[in-house]
């Protein structure tokens, strides 16, 4: 449920009811995974506030998007969770007709969750919308060879987007993703990841695809022991 307070500001709330079953683990070497085995019932209520001044939800060039959410879980697990998400966009240059825009953007995600959070609700990183250069959830804490995620995340990206064609249907990007997911609320140098890279954005409005296709190549220069790296990623959407 949401309500718009001003043209740029809105509030929202919701309830999530889930029954989650975890069984037959490939490895039984993780205490956190073993503690989550069986069927669990979760009842999660959340409230949030969003301020959105972007000029576009697909490929923004000016403005910002800020969201803050708080969740409280009940049922078989009881814990609190808080998330902050900020994205800002700055237009560097455009042609006189408004096309050919060069944009720099910055994004950061900060999240905390309680120590009673089950493994399937922990934070994980790795993949297009978190840390490129790593496999899906491949930049997350390990326990006994099992990806258990963590109670804290701080993920960031800096990106420069520029046109490669006069029609703006093909754009290039240079970026650097960096940050960490930790089992506890802390930042340790050994777990900090950094992955610069480049990519392309392909828009096909004639094919009825509103969101651009994203093709990215990232090369981790800092990673944690046990991380799964993956240079190429593909995505269709507007998460970045």
Feature map (PLM): residue ranges:
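C-terminal beta-signal and terminal closure region of outer-membrane beta-barrel proteins
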Residues: 187-240
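C-terminal outer-membrane beta-barrel translocator/porin domains of Gram-negative envelope proteins
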Residues: 16-19, 26-170, 174-191, 223-226, ...
